[in-house]
Amino acid sequence: LGDKLTAFAPHTTGIPFYKRERDCSMEIIKQMYDIACLYDLTEHLNPTDETYDRLVVQELGYRNLTDTDKEDVLQDTFNAAMNISTKGLLDKDEFQLYLSGITRIRGFIHSESYSLESAIRDASKVAYITASLMTQNKELKHYSSDIAPEFQDASIEQPFNTKLNKLKKTNFEAFYYWFETYRLLQNH
């Protein structure tokens, strides 16, 4: 999980949008999908956090990013997840690349009919893991439909991105993870 997280940071340690003019958006989405699948099997961030810390330092060194640190990489991952979940609110051009990757990866995912809504769900899990790493939260929570009623009145407030509240009506699982992310970062 730690290595996948370093790969889903397109502006720092991760797969870039382009390698020698080749569109790598599908590979970026593949990393996000893999992170979400691994997350579903993970209860604790130990030893993921240690692996992540070690690999971030290595990847930053390989790329000679001397002015970049772990927090910058986590923010890069978080911003990518936010941009997907808000359908381009942070960067519309990058969102178009993510959409291209989502469309192109459909033929490789056989467990479900992968869509933008699936990607938003996966991005919300990535955001939650990222926030957990930012706040040293080790215990991971997982969505189940039986806990949905207790979140019906939940609301994400400013200065966090309140557009995420729209997910409550369209993708409740994604809203759940964004709300848990909000709760973690609210006190950070």
Language model regions located:
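Catalytic cores of NTP-dependent nucleotidyl/adenyl transfer enzymes across multiple folds
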Residues: 1-111, 117-188
